Regions:
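Lumenal/extracellular ectodomains and adaptor appendage modules
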Residues: 1-191
């Protein structure tokens, strides 16, 4: 049996313990999925004892803080405790993130005068907060598409979903600190 110990840390404004945070240990293996819960103490410490060691299993810890899921994959067989689970304060100020790079590739132009375009956008949150768009549609992470674009396909590591908005699409996801790629492709008629 294994012991998993870690610390819940709020990174907004410094590294402070997140007292009382409910932390979930996840174990995924061929025999199924098992969850266990622990509460972070006054020092942000959480501990799971009696964790079954299963060869080939995947492990992780997660917590929901201010409505946002934070998590980290772990390897309890490695001798590098404690696990650090970082959380951040939620804000709806879109200055928390920026577009750091954008590329447009015309991948193919075919006979019926149709282009296949691929756009790759790098979104970065360099702040110590998590951007949460709230209910205002104008606060969503929005992307414009050219007139006549069709067959949109969106791929990103950001959570949430892509929804259609006027003149393009938007992502409903929060943006935690870090860097994320948003890739989308579409077909476009040309003359």
């Amino acid at each position: 049996e294994l012991v998993v110990e870690g610390r819940a840390i709020n990174r907004t404004g410094g590294d402070t313990p997140e007292v009382g945070l409910v932390v979930t240990l996840h174990q995924e293996s061929v025999s199924g999925h098992v969850d266990a819960e622990a509460v972070a103490d006054i020092d942000g410490i959480f501990r799971f004892e009696g964790v079954e060691s299963i060869e080939g299993a995947s492990y992780g810890v997660s917590a929901i803080y201010q409505g946002i899921m934070y998590g980290v994959d772990i390897d309890p067989l490695q001798a590098e405790p404690p696990v650090e689970l970082f959380v951040f304060e939620a804000v709806d100020d879109d200055s928390a993130f920026s577009i750091e790079a954008a590329s447009l590739l015309i991948v193919q132009a075919d006979e019926p005068r149709t282009l296949w375009a691929l756009e790759i956008i790098t979104v970065a949150n360099r702040s110590d907060t998590t951007y949460v768009p709230g209910t205002d549609p104008m606060k969503l992470l929005r992307f414009a598409l050219p007139a006549g674009a069709r067959d949109l396909s969106v791929e990103t590591a950001l959570p949430g979903e892509a929804i259609q908005v006027d003149l393009g699409f938007a992502l409903t996801s929060e943006i935690q600190p870090g860097e994320y790629e948003v890739m989308f492709s579409y077909m476009l008629p040309y003359e």
